[in-house]
Amino acid sequence: MENRWQVMIVWQVDRMRINTWKSLVKYHMYVSKKANRWRYRHHYDSNHPKISSEVHIPLGDAELVVTTYWGLHTGEREWHLGQGVSIEWRLKKYRTQVDPGLADQLIHIYYFDCFSESAIRKALLGHRVSPRCEYQAGHTQVGSLQYLALTALIAPKKTKPPVPSVQKLVEDRWNKPQKTRGHRGSHTMSGQ
């Protein structure tokens, strides 16, 4: 029987960012209790030698699993010291990988207080609404005019420490795409 390869998307992340992610997850699991249903698996609980940790986040019947890896091949830069993160959505036997933005939205739907679009209707009907969102990473679109007016009326309160964001975990701070600048007379660089 021949070897069968399975390809996974692993986001290269520096070690300090992974440590920050782990400490934020543990803080919200054990201290603030906002993520008390989450499960943290240490490297010694896994039988895979490259897995550093796993965070299992229940989402109704499904769960989101954020796995951190170590000992991978180094990346293009010296700070990519073989560390990585994969994000997987599981429902019974079905598994698929998701991107960090979608992972943040899924976490946002199930956890943490939110001042969302439904707050507009509740406020108009005279109901009491939660004045702020604790998980700003879950909002990717620009809100409606009424939503923006309500959020401008009530200033967001910064939570310390912040809620763990998967998108912030895999964000690449150092490798921003560089803008191409040519010489003054170069038509090939400016596209003219």
Curated annotation (Swiss-Prot):
Cited function: Counteracts the innate antiviral activity of host APOBEC3F and APOBEC3G by promoting their ubiquitination and degradation. Acts as a substrate recognition component of an E3 ubiquitin-protein ligase complex: mechanistically, Vif hijacks a host cullin-5-RING E3 ubiquitin-protein ligase complex (ECS complex) and the transcription coactivator CBFB/CBF-beta to form an active E3 ubiquitin-protein ligase complex that targets APOBEC3G and APOBEC3F for polyubiquitination, leading to their degradation by the proteasome.
Additional remark text: Vif-defective viruses show catastrophic failure in reverse transcription due to APOBEC-induced mutations that initiate a DNA base repair pathway and compromise the structural integrity of the ssDNA. In the absence of Vif, the virion is morphologically abnormal. HIV-1 lineages are divided in three main groups, M (for Major), O (for Outlier), and N (for New, or Non-M, Non-O). The vast majority of strains found worldwide belong to the group M. Group O seems to be endemic to and largely confined to Cameroon and neighboring countries in West Central Africa, where these viruses represent a small minority of HIV-1 strains. The group N is represented by a limited number of isolates from Cameroonian persons. The group M is further subdivided in 9 clades or subtypes (A to D, F to H, J and K).
Gene Ontology cellular component annotations, sorted alphabetically: host cell cytoplasm; host cell plasma membrane; membrane; virion component
Phosphothreonine modifications at: 96, 188
Annotated stretches, region: Interaction with host APOBEC3F and APOBEC3G: 54-72
Quaternary structure and partners: Homomultimer; in vitro and presumably in vivo. Interacts with viral RNA and Pr55Gag precursor; these interactions mediate Vif incorporation into the virion. Interacts with the viral reverse transcriptase. Forms cullin-5-RING E3 ubiquitin-protein ligase complex (ECS complex) by interacting with host CUL5, RBX2, elongin BC complex (ELOB and ELOC) and CBFB/CBF-beta. Within the ECS complex, Vif interacts directly with host CUL5, ELOC and APOBEC (APOBEC3F and APOBEC3G) substrates.
Renumbered residue ranges of the record's region RNA-binding: 75-114
PTM annotation (Phosphoserine): residues: 144, 165
Keyword terms, alphabetized: AIDS, Host cell membrane, Host cytoplasm, Host membrane, Host-virus interaction, Membrane, Metal-binding, Phosphoprotein, RNA-binding, Ubl conjugation, Ubl conjugation pathway, Virion, Zinc
Basic residues composition-biased segments: 176-186
Protein name: Virion infectivity factor
Site (Cleavage in virion (by viral protease)): 150-151
Annotated organism of origin: Human immunodeficiency virus type 1 group M subtype K (isolate 97ZR-EQTB11) (HIV-1)
Primary subcellular site in the record, as a coarse category: host cell
Motif (BC-box-like motif): 144-153
Electron transport in keyword set: no
